[in-house]
């Protein structure tokens, strides 16, 4: 079972109406049985509808989807979108994490996680949750630390230990420095395995930053992970794209992992 998190820069109608870009996005996403797409800027779900039409071009049931409401503290909103193959997994439940009072200024996240619980008959772990996060870069340390609270909430709500937390955490370079990791519970607690190392480069730009991460908790989920399968997918190299074309698709690579 192949899972990925992909921050597709400004994913919306403009990008999906470009035949070249949309065909590469579909080609990338078809690698996966579950894909989280972040930075979905699509208030009326027009781009999401087009994406699903394209993914299901050959078979109307290749992919289904779950999408969050538009999330954000001001007029700038993003959605979390999951596309998945229903012949491999099914959605058991979803909920929007409540991170506090936005208007009071004491909420924990710019885009609070929209959590999904999947059933997966073909893997060792039969049910697991995915917690998505696209952090606000300037608050990355605090937001990644707050994912620990989301983990506890999911664990309690669904009586579930097998939880994957993933997305563009902005977890490197100037946003999270080496001295700050010690203040991040998601990192210091032995409950969690960080599958994408700090040395990884998840950016399609000239920077070398491990912004995008996959973190797993729960013994069944951790034992289902195929050893070295957690890597960024460098679509530029894989498809022989120019820098310009790669960046037109996104400034991030997907991060992926395989479960058995």
Curated annotation (Swiss-Prot):
A GO biological-process term: regulation of acute inflammatory response
Pfam families attached to this UniProt entry: Exo_endo_phos
Active-site positions on this chain: 78, 134
InterPro entries assigned: Deoxyribonuclease-1_AS, DNase_I, DNASE_I_2, Endo/exonu/phosph_ase_sf, Endo/exonuclease/phosphatase
Site (Involved in actin-binding): 13, 67
Keyword Disulfide bond: yes
Glycan-carrying positions: 18
Function: Serum endocuclease secreted into body fluids by a wide variety of exocrine and endocrine organs. Expressed by non-hematopoietic tissues and preferentially cleaves protein-free DNA. Among other functions, seems to be involved in cell death by apoptosis. Binds specifically to G-actin and blocks actin polymerization. Together with DNASE1L3, plays a key role in degrading neutrophil extracellular traps (NETs). NETs are mainly composed of DNA fibers and are released by neutrophils to bind pathogens during inflammation.
Family: Belongs to the DNase I family.
UniProt name for this protein: Deoxyribonuclease-1
Species this protein is from: Ovis aries
Encoding gene (name): DNASE1
